[in-house]
From Swiss-Prot:
Keyword hit for Acetylation: no
Protein family membership: Belongs to the UPF0587 family.
Keyword Cell cycle: no
Protein name: CXXC motif containing zinc binding protein
Domain remarks: The N-terminal and the C-terminal half of the protein have a very similar 3D-structure, suggesting they arose from duplication. Requires a bound zinc ion for normal folding and solubility.
Disulfide bond sites: none
GO molecular function per UniProt: zinc ion binding
Length: 160
């Protein structure tokens, strides 16, 4: 199946360096089986810190899952070296923030939640534990004395 990029697009107000924080950051995804096309009904998360051995000693993956419909074992791996921040200059443009190595599982939807961080453009103030589940986030930068926000968060998957 190959590699699939997750691209993010958002409107940033007075913040930059929007990024997922830590190896325990949860990427909430809905997956599709590459064999039969079954799509998971529930959100599932994968984390960088999780590593599951593949059958037959073929390495490991962030998630290994048996399809409920066709019983095929599929896996997906977060490629840690591809995790990127979304910056002020990326404002309102799609940018790849992570790549997944997909072996039978294809992500079809993404739900950003808690665990993001960003910084004030002028002040460098760090805003941690940003939750993007509502696709919007607002706060106030005391140092810069201005409102900050992240709005209209959307995403797309691109096969590479």
């Amino acid at each position: 199946m190959g590699k699939i990029e997750l691209q993010l697009k958002a409107t940033l107000e007075n913040v930059t360096n929007l990024r997922p924080v830590g190896e325990d950051f949860r990427w909430y995804l809905k997956m599709k089986c590459g064999n039969c096309g079954e799509i998971s009904e529930k959100w599932q998360y994968i984390r960088l810190m999780d590593s599951v051995a593949l059958k037959g000693g073929r390495g490991s993956a962030s998630m290994v899952q048996k399809c409920k419909l066709c019983s095929r074992e599929n896996s997906i791996e977060i490629l840690s070296s591809t995790i990127k921040s979304y910056n002020a200059e990326d404002n309102e443009k799609f940018k790849t923030i992570v790549e997944f190595e997909c072996r039978g599982l294809e992500p079809v939807d993404f739900q950003p939640q808690a665990g993001f961080a960003a910084e004030g453009v002028e002040s460098g103030t760090v805003f941690s534990d940003i939750n993007l589940q509502e696709k919007d986030w607002t706060d106030y930068d005391e140092k810069a004395q201005e409102s900050v926000g992240i709005y209209e968060v959307t995403h797309q998957f691109v096969k590479c």
